[in-house]
């Protein structure tokens, strides 16, 4: 892993709200207000990250809106619509040994306990009971699978996660 990690995307700026530069916020954090625990934000404009600070935020019905420092008009806010919100990777808190950020699991090779390479984690789906790894099978998968969905349940299906090697060991039948 390089010493300079990519910023971690936490949300997206939505449409403008009102005439004073407020924006609706789409957040990917566990709790809606969790995105405001991070400062400063990075927003991506024309392929470049730039630092911004939240001046104020509030709940607006079921939505959450924010005003960024230096953004005072509706036109300025509209220019930022759909920009990604991120933070430097260094701002992310360290997790306990048995917990992982999704971004660290995506791209990991998935090997079952019999040594069969099941493919690569493409995305993770949140269900009500547990997260599920969406594993894209290798092009020449011996079982004719294009993808597999493996529940991320430690000690039952997930035997070991080795982030340094980018590998996840699973107890999962490749024919599933």
UniProtKB/Swiss-Prot annotation:
Keywords: Chaperone, Cytoplasm, Ribosome biogenesis, rRNA processing. Pfam families: PRC_RimM, RimM. One of its GO terms (biological process) is ribosomal small subunit biogenesis. It is found in: Cytoplasm. Its main location: cytoplasm. Residues 97-176 form the PRC barrel domain. One of its GO terms (cellular component) is cytoplasm. Coiled coil: none annotated. GO terms for molecular function: ribosome binding. An accessory protein needed during the final step in the assembly of 30S ribosomal subunit, possibly for assembly of the head region. Essential for efficient processing of 16S rRNA. May be needed both before and after RbfA during the maturation of 16S rRNA. It has affinity for free ribosomal 30S subunits but not for 70S ribosomes. The PRC barrel domain binds ribosomal protein uS19. Belongs to the RimM family. Binds ribosomal protein uS19. NCBIfam families: 16S_RimM. This is Ribosome maturation factor RimM. It comes from Shewanella halifaxensis (strain HAW-EB4). The lineage of its organism: Bacteria, Pseudomonadati, Pseudomonadota, Gammaproteobacteria, Alteromonadales.
């Amino acid at each position: 892993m390089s010493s300079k990690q990519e910023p971690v995307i936490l949300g997206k700026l939505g449409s403008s709200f009102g005439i004073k530069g407020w924006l609706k916020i789409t957040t990917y954090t566990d709790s809606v207000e969790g995105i405001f625990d991070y400062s400063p934000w990075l927003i991506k404009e024309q392929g470049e990250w730039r630092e911004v600070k939240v001046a104020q935020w509030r709940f607006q019905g079921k939505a959450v809106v924010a005003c960024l420092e230096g953004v005072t008009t509706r036109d300025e806010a509209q220019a930022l619509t759909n920009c990604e919100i991120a933070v430097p990777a260094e701002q992310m808190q360290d997790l306990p040994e048995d917990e992982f950020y999704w971004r660290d699991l995506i791209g990991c090779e998935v090997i079952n306990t019999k040594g069969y390479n099941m493919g690569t984690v493409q995305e993770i789906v949140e269900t009500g009971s547990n997260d599920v790894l969406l594993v894209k099978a290798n092009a020449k998968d011996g079982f004719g699978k294009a993808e597999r969905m493996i529940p991320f349940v430690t000690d039952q299906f997930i035997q070991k996660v080795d982030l340094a090697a980018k590998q996840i060991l699973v107890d999962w039948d490749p024919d599933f």
